[in-house]
Amino acid sequence: MESNNVVLLDFWPSSFGMRLRIALALKGIKYEAKEENLSDKSPLLLEMNPVHKKIPILIHNSKAICESLNILEYIDEVWHDKCPLLPSDPYERSQARFWADYIDKKIYSTGRRVWSGKGEDQEEAKKEFIEILKTLEGELGNKTYFGGDNLGFVDVALVPFTSWFYSYETCANFSIEAECPKLVVWAKTCMESESVSKSLPHPHKIYGFVLELKHKLGLA
């Protein structure tokens, strides 16, 4: 189904924005992408998200929806006829939300400490990050995707962060594949979907952004 009047305010390296690019692609929704400069936020961004003043923001029929997991659910509910992301079973749906929330609370903040940290702080962050990934790998088990046989809510919530894996590994000198081989296989399976592969920047491009950011923050 095509949709009219859908705008996504986004920033290309944002894993949270990537989630929505994937979901919109899976659903076949046409939209206008507006790239934001986070050091000089647009009047539209400030108007549409006056509380947090953050991207991503989905604007649908002139109404703003904020916070990426909330937007993911909105997309799934509004365009429910293609590629459902959340399971129909209430218990399974609650579990998908639990793991997506776990990803939100753990991956970004710990990952940031991995690429930006030094010495003991970085080593501690790396240890924590690996434990988080191992917890997620345990939940994945022997399934193809987190929800079973089809790409779903938890996959879309997590897979954008895999575009940052190279940066984490390079900055902190470790191998995610050595620690969590099943998770890396899962990531490669997700990337077989064009909706995923075309929505994620190349890991080397992300690494270039990380180096620029470290320099800007005086961490280089």
From Swiss-Prot:
Induction of synthesis: By auxin.
Pfam families xref list: GST_C (PF00043), GST_N (PF02798)
Chemical reaction(s) catalysed: RX + glutathione = an S-substituted glutathione + a halide anion + H(+)
A biological-process GO annotation: glutathione metabolic process
GO cellular component, one term: cytoplasm
Alphabetized UniProt keyword annotations: Auxin signaling pathway, Transferase
EC number: 2.5.1.18
Residue span, GST C-terminal domain: 89-209
InterPro entries, A to Z: Glutathione-S-Trfase_C-like, Glutathione-S-Trfase_C_sf, Glutathione_S-Trfase, Glutathione_S-Trfase_N, GST_C, GST_C_Tau, Omega/Tau-like, Thioredoxin-like_sf
Domain of life of the organism encoding this protein: Eukaryota
Record-linked PROSITE patterns: GST_CTER (PS50405), GST_NTER (PS50404)
Gene3D superfamilies: 1.20.1050.10, Glutaredoxin
Residues annotated for glutathione binding in this entry: S14, K41, I55, E67, S68
All residue ranges annotated as the GST N-terminal domain in the record: 4-83
MF GO annotations: glutathione transferase activity
Entry similarity comment: Belongs to the GST superfamily. HSP26 family.
PANTHER family found in the cross-reference section: GLUTATHIONE S-TRANSFERASE PARA-RELATED (PTHR11260:SF756), GLUTATHIONE S-TRANSFERASE, GST, SUPERFAMILY, GST DOMAIN CONTAINING (PTHR11260)
Protein name: Probable glutathione S-transferase parA
Native organism: Nicotiana tabacum
Protein encoded by which gene: PARA
